[in-house]
Amino acid sequence: MNVDALTGGFDRRDWQEQTATDNPVRFAMIGVGWWTTEQAMPAVDAGDLCETTVLVSSDREKAADVAADSETVEHAITYEEFHDGAASDAYDAVYIVTPNALHLPYVETAAELDKAILCEKPMEATIERAERMVEVCDEHDATLMIAYRMHTEPAVRRAKDLIDEGYIGEPLFVHGNMTEPILELVPDPDQWRLDGELSGGCAVMDIGIYPLNTSRFLLDADPVAVRGTVASVQEEFADVPDEHGAFQLDFPGHVYAVCTASQNAHLDSHISVLGTEGKVRVEPAFYPWDDRALQLSHEGTTVEIDFEQIDQMEEEFEYFAHCLLTDTEPYADGEHGLVDINTIKSVYEASETESTVRLD
C-alpha cells in the first residue's frame, strides 16, 4: 500500500474557493458560556472570513466583560434586546450555543431579522421544535446550518474520500463510540445536560449524535431503521433517560452502524468503517483537542496517517462564512439536522418499546 498515494493531493479545505475578504461575515454569539469564550471566539479570531461583533447573554455585565477583552466586539446586549432587534446592523449571522430547548426562539428572531444562522447540534430538544426551525428559515429564506464539526475535520474528510474512492470496497459495517465522564469535565450536578427538559436527552442526544451523524457523512446515506437500549443508573442522571446508550442503525443496501455513548465513562472516541476489501478508522475521532490518526487496512497491510491537531471550530466557522460569501448552500442544513433528531428520538422509542423503529 503506497502511503504517499493515499495522502498526496489531499486538500485540507477542498471546499474552499475564497481565501480572503474585505467584508468578513460578522457574528453575534448567542450565549456567552465557556464554549463561546474558549472555543468559538478564538476560532473566529483565528480565521480570515469572519469576526465576532456582538455578544448576547442573560447577563449584560458578563457579556460586557468578555467584550472588553475583544478587539472586534462592538456590542454586548441581553437576550431581550436581541429579540427586540438591538444592534442588528452590527452582525450578519448568529451562532447559537444555548441549551438545546432554547434554540428555537433565537432562530425565529434571527430569521425574521434576515440573518444567517449557525446553530449548535442537536438542533433542538424535540422533533416538533426542530421542524419549526426549518419552517421559519424557509419562510424568511434564511440560511441555516447545524454545527457538525466532523464535516470539516481533515482526517474524517480524508476517510470519506478513501471510502468514496473504493479503497475498502463496499462498506458493510460502521462502529462508532463517544464517551466521557461529564461530571468530571463539568462538575455541576445542576448543569443543563442533566435536565431532560432543557437537553431533550443525555448521552445519545449530546454525544451519541457524533457517531450517528459521522456515520451518515462517511456513508453518504441516511438510516432507515433503528434499534436501541438506553439506561440511567446513577442518581445524578435520574432526570434523563440515557446516562448510557447503545444503538444500531440500518442503512440502505444492508449496511449497519453500531454506536455507543455514555456521559459517565472513560473518555474515548473513535469511528471505523469496514468494507469488503478493507477498513478505515479514525481515533481519536470527536473531541476537538486531539491529534488524529487515520488507520487504513487493505490487502493484508495496515498503515497509519497522522493528522496534526487543527482548530475544528475555526474550520467550521470558516466553512460557514465561506458558504455565505460564495452563496453556497451548507452541507448540514436544517433538513440534514432533522434526520438526526428523528433518529435519536427513535432510539429512545426503540429502547422503551424493545422494538425496531422504522424511519421515514
From Swiss-Prot:
Catalytic EC class? oxidoreductase
Q: Which EC number(s) are documented for this chain?
A: 1.1.1.424
Signal peptide, first to last residue? none
Q: What Gene3D superfamilies does the annotation carry?
A: Dihydrodipicolinate Reductase, domain 2 (3.30.360.10), NAD(P)-binding Rossmann-like Domain (3.40.50.720)
Question: Matching Pfam families, A to Z?
Answer: GFO_IDH_MocA (PF01408), GFO_IDH_MocA_C3 (PF22725)
Query: In Gene Ontology terms, what is one molecular function of this protein?
Result: oxidoreductase activity
pH and activity:
Optimum pH is 8.3.
Can you state which reaction this protein catalyses?
D-xylofuranose + NADP(+) = D-xylono-1,4-lactone + NADPH + H(+)
Induction (record text): Expression is induced during growth on D-xylose.
Task: Share what the entry says about its subunit structure, partners included.
Answer: Homotretramer.
So what family is this one in?
Belongs to the Gfo/Idh/MocA family.
Q: Which NCBIfam families match?
A: XylDh_Gfo6_Halo
Q: What is this protein called?
A: D-xylose 1-dehydrogenase [NADP(+)]
Task: Give the organism's phylogenetic lineage.
Answer: Archaea, Methanobacteriati, Methanobacteriota, Stenosarchaea group, Halobacteria
